């Protein structure tokens, strides 16, 4: 079992766009200001191990908890009236992950190893933006459809490999690997001003699901102590899909 706690405070330089009110966003200039930091990061590792005559296994949990005590930072514009503008800070987020790994020896020459993992990552920090500047060229034409992203991503992984030392000089292997990154965040339409300050744009966030399969059949033959021949067949397949797309 392992637990870590880290507190970070101070300031870090960060660059972002700023423009004088009531000008349009086409009058933007780059500002570099010290952004206050007040972070708390905690990680947890817990594992249980088992070892038998022919097999071994490990079940583990990993948790990561990041919290930013600030949500937004307000600063005075570089020109024009004394108007404050808003810059969001890093969003707080949480990750939970379960892992299972192990292996088994069928015989002295044939062995199998594999692993499974399941992770859940979430982020639900409130948005920070200057909706009050519209319609004078502010970033948002209308208020955001949601107060926060309410983002969540589920990741799944599985792998399995079988090896066989067929002869002294010949080794055969077969392996499979599967990865699935499923973004469950809802898709919403966000309306904001384009960079020219005259046109508006409507863009949805696009939560994608990406699945990847990998397979390999291979043989290694040792010619002598310094040379060997490897023959392998690999198959990679990637699927991308979007279950929801705001219109």
List where the protein language model places each region.
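Residues on the lipid-exposed face of transmembrane beta-strands in outer-membrane beta-barrel proteins
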Residues: 1, 46-50, 100-104, 160-164, ...
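Post-signal-peptide, soluble extracytosolic/periplasmic N-terminal scaffold domains
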Residues: 1-56, 61-64, 74
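Hydrophobic, lipid-facing positions within transmembrane beta-strands of outer-membrane proteins
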Residues: 42-46, 94-100, 156-160, 213-217, ...
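Outer-membrane beta-barrel translocator domains and adjoining extracellular loop/strand segments
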Residues: 11-20, 25, 29-34, 70-78, ...
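Transmembrane beta-strands of outer-membrane beta-barrel pores
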Residues: 3-9, 52-56, 63-67, 118-122, ...
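Outer-membrane beta-barrel strand-turn architecture
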Residues: 51-54, 94, 104-108, 164-170, ...
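Repeated loop/turn-to-beta-strand initiation elements of outer-membrane beta-barrel proteins
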Residues: 1, 9, 54-59, 108-114, ...
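Short sequence motifs at beta-strands and strand-loop junctions characteristic
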Residues: 36-40, 90-94, 150-154, 207-211, ...
């Amino acid at each position: 079992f392992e637990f870590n706690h880290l507190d970070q405070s101070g300031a870090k330089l960060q660059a972002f766009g700023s423009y004088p009110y009531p000008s349009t966003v086409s009058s933007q200039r780059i500002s570099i200001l010290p952004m206050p930091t007040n972070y708390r990061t905690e990680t947890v590792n817990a594992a249980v191990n088992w070892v038998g005559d022919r097999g071994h296994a490990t079940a583990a949990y990993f948790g990561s908890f990041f919290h930013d005590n600030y949500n937004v930072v307000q600063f005075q514009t570089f020109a024009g009236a004394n108007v404050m503008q808003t810059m969001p800070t890093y969003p707080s987020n949480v990750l939970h992950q379960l892992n299972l790994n192990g292996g088994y020896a069928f015989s002295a020459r044939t062995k199998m190893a594999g692993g499974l993992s399941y992770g859940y990552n979430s982020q639900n920090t409130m948005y920070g933006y200057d909706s009050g500047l519209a319609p004078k060229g502010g970033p948002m034409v209308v208020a955001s459809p949601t107060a926060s992203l309410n983002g969540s991503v589920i990741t799944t992984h599985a792998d399995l490999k079988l090896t066989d030392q067929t002869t002294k000089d010949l080794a055969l292997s077969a392996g499979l690997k599967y990865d699935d990154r499923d973004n469950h965040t809802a898709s919403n339409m966000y309306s904001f001003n384009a960079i020219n300050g005259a046109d508006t744009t409507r863009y949805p966030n696009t939560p994608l699901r990406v699945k990847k399969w990998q397979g390999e059949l291979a043989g290694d033959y040792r010619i002598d102590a310094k040379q060997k021949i490897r023959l392998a067949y690999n198959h990679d397949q990637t699927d991308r899909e979007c279950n929801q797309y705001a219109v």
